[in-house]
Amino acid sequence: MVKSIIGAMKYDSGEVKLNGKPVHFLSPHDAIQEHIAFIPENRKEEGLFLDTSIANNMFMVNYNRISRKGILRKKLKKNFLNTFFSKLDIRPNDPEKPARDFSGGNQQKAILAKWMAIEPTIMILDEPTRGIDIGAKAEIYKLMDNLSKKGCSIIMVSSEMTEIIGMCDRVIVMAEGRVTAELDRTEFSQERIMAASSETTQKAG
């Protein structure tokens, strides 16, 4: 579903609204122009070019921030990297190393840095902490919380119950392509979410 929202996949029915107005993104580029960021579930196949430097991965949607009149500026490039490597504590502090040489947590932080640089108003994260260690998870949760406090709306897709309950203000449960529940913080619990997630299957049985 989230790929349909950003124009990466076509949808058969329904509509997407932004600030109360219908929008139809033909490609992810259209979504980027509206400051909508998307962090995919499979970072190694969809989020990064593993044999390319982590720096160039971060520049791919931010070329205008490190160039003037189409010409790359070394000072802007250096400042950009210093800012985000420091802010997100990306390690090792070597932006010219290939992305594959970074741990899963640091790869994910580099992807977040790339999209944070566009100053998103909406950030969609698909399974943002899958396959990373506990320490990196805590850092990513903190980054998400800070973005939210600055006014960025966060849409997180997750299959981890503790993550959902710990991070979300509102939960929308989907099962077999349809919404089965919409719960705010005062309403949701593990039991209610699990019941809603199996609702369609139970009806079919």
Annotate each language-model stretch with its function:
Residues 1-205:
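Glycine-rich phosphate-binding loops of nucleotide-dependent enzymes
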